[in-house]
Amino acid sequence: MSDQTAQQGAGVASTPTDIDQQETREWLDALSAVIDKEGAERAHFLIEQMLEHARQSSIDMPFSANTGYVNTIETSQEARCPGNLEIEGRLRAYMRWNAMAMVVKANRHHPPEGGDLGGHIGSFASLANMFGAGFNHFWHAESENHGGDLLYIQGHVSPGIYARAYLEGRLSEEQLLNFRQEVDGKGLSSYPHPKLMPEFWQFPTVSMGLGPLMAIYQARFLKYLHARGIANTENRKVWVFCGDGEMDEVESLGAIGLAARENLDNLIFVINCNLQRLDGPVRGNGKIIQELEGEFRGSGWNVIKLLWGKGWDDLLARDKDGALRKIMMECNDGDYQSFKANDGAYVRKNFFGRDPRTLKMVEHMSDDEIWNLRRGGHDAQKVYAAFKAANEHKGQPTVLLVKTVKGFGMGKIGEGKNTVHQTKKLGDEDIKAFRDRFNIPIPDSQIADLPFYKPADDTPEMKYLHERRKALGGYLPHRRTKADESFTVPALETFKAVLDPTPEGREISTTQAYVRFLTQLLRDQALGPRVVPILVDEARTFGMEGLFRQIGIYNPHGQQYTPVDKDQVMYYKEDKAGQILQEGINEAGGMSSWIAAATSYSTNNRIMVPFYVYYSMFGFQRIGDLAWAAGDMQARGFLLGGTSGRTTLNGEGLQHEDGHSHILANTIPNCVSYDPTFAHEVAVIMHDGLKRMVERQENVFYYLTLLNENYAMPGLQPGTEEQIIKGMYLCKQAPALPQGAPAVQLLGSGTILRESFFAQELLEKDWGVAASVWSCPSFNELTRDGQEADRWNLLHPTEAARVSYVEEQLARTTGPIVASTDYMKAYAEQIRPFVPKGRTYKVLGTDGFGRSDFRSKLREHFEINRHYIVVAALKGLAEDGVVPASKVAEAIQKYGINTDKINPLYA
């Protein structure tokens, strides 16, 4: 085998030997001539034609989504910034100073219990130029003529945003002094949190990775609103700021294919490529910018790289033989970090010194001049040009890969250092160096006090600051807390078909009840169009396929094929104005769409009512971080956990059977959760949710678990509506037994409440015990009510004690209390403190891993069926001294309970 053959056989990683350099030169010269005379677009077309011809000729063409390690926009193609860059530079300097001062001041506190408040200086320092360009020239606030651009701001840069708002007069010095000190109501939150600063921050972007994911679905939802004629969103943009290290979060890149597929040209990602994450380099041995370029371009995005500032323009223009470009590509990110952590002499030797030709290029430059060769993200003009190109691009989402230095301007204390992310304490000399670097007019005598700096209102800088925001409609970030519009929710009687008993011999599930409720709501002329059904490829599972034809599935491209089931009544209909959001097998996407719709009252001044239904096990457990973010964003809407209950979804097994989603739901303070048993409970609860979230615009969202088990529905008992909402009502009176017969109270929720009905019959027939059965649609709401009463009593010891709703209901009864649910024991255990004093309380639940089998077998395995309820009731009576313990043993034997079987918790 020849050397050349061996090299070619090694694959695409090898470069074949140039056997005819003159021919190669002629081809390259021809391409250069086309570029010079006819432009880059024509050259691109010709190259594509040649590649296609090669493929058609069966030549294996290796694909690369990468371009050279240079700026995408040529200097000659840069749009000139119309602003006053000198004034903008001074304003940025003041913001840098105030952001630094805020963090350093916060960490000078030394409370007796110790501890630092934290904060970050380095991140904002690296992208101040980008925020300057956006705030001064691109980002519109909501106004009469514009719905407002949406900004997902990188969490760690919050001090810089506060520093800007301080100059604008939106935040006071007292608030800056209380950075990360929020308890007394004067402080500023650590990161963007709408819950904590409801009129300021719109979107929480920490945990990292959630911002990019949510933003993609937010941009898609803007298109959805426009396509359905609900709001004009065509001139609005979604800008997303992320860190290059953040892109390793799987959520960051997980939905970029959707953005390209749906042509979300209203979406712009700005990835701050300072090459560092918290501990060290993002890709020390590689090039994160090239990696991300390949990811995004390969997914169909428009990619703009901004790597080098204007100081490099002349050097690149003189780089006729490509030596400089070659070194730029060869240096890895670890090298680039080292260059900025050292000095100009180091850069001369270790960067330019790699090739005699590049070393000669800079022989006329001093070490300081070499050091001041900036990266693209620190060049205001080039940032403006890149932003303008991104803002005007049509047909694709755009990503800006902007190279910066983490800790820019922090000097030896942090610039380019691995420790910069944690740097929050600066000494006086470091502060002086920072001041001098950015020409802040603060004398040495005040350095120790580290004052904030704000020019007088009549200075050119302050006038310019306000003029630019006035031209763009107002100040950002800003959050709307209520929509201007209002709706009246249809009366509860509208949902009569769900409230009434099922006809004799007819059985339905609570999932079917939900679908009936939703279908009726969709018919409401006012509110119906605002309903947003969200699916993750489970419509047929939940019996919702009838909605496909009725309201259509949203697809911006319509339906360009004939569906295989077109001849059927419920065919799969995609439509440009479709109402259903079908996310495929994608719970994170479904939740992100739900969040976009659930916060539309704030982001779009349009009240929307999202209903997202999914396998309950794949809800809070799978996307818990997004659910927490939804709480932070004050989301309003319905989450429906279908096929719920550890023993009710009988055949699916361990990963599908949910026994703890309500425990997780209760960790979110503004999540109101219910586990209804009956259709009428579903209707009453959902109607209450509509009243609270739509009519009264309360900042809550609802979680309901739904069942796939069919049974007869008893219908609403008039007068129990409020009790259902509170979480507990007597649904079946105890049978009339002789006076003095033992009494017990059976509590339950979901389908296991029906086991209590059967247990009631067994207790009467086999043991002469009178059992009352209570439906408890929400042990979580009962718990919150009880805890609220407890708290009030703790803080008002001299006033009459408040009584919890649980105690109020059970105080009128006698006998032990047995609660059984299809969830872990912890769910019903929560109300134990509120059970009347002296009463025995037993809890049955489904602790342990799920498994596949029939429902009856699973309920026996988890010890929650009617027989275990009877045994628990008798045990409670025995502990109360009402029946002998032998009765319990007798029941165990009668019902064939295996006392030696393994505890289901460990099975």
Q: What residues fall within each predicted segment?
A:
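Short alpha-helical segments and helix-capping/turn motifs at coil-helix boundaries
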Residues: 113-117, 129-138, 144-148, 199-203, ...
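Thiamine diphosphate
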Residues: 3-5, 184-204, 210, 224-235, ...
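A structural-propensity feature for long, helix-poor, extended segments
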Residues: 240-241, 247, 625-646, 651
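N-terminal amphipathic, basic-rich helices that act as targeting or association modules
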Residues: 2-168, 434, 508-524, 528, ...
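Cofactor-binding active-site loop characterized by glycine-rich and histidine/acidic residues
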Residues: 82-95, 99-114, 120-262, 285-286, ...
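Glycine- and acidic
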Residues: 12-13, 30-33, 80-88, 107-119, ...
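Residue-level marker for buried hydrophobic side chains located in beta-strands
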Residues: 240-241, 269, 534, 640, ...
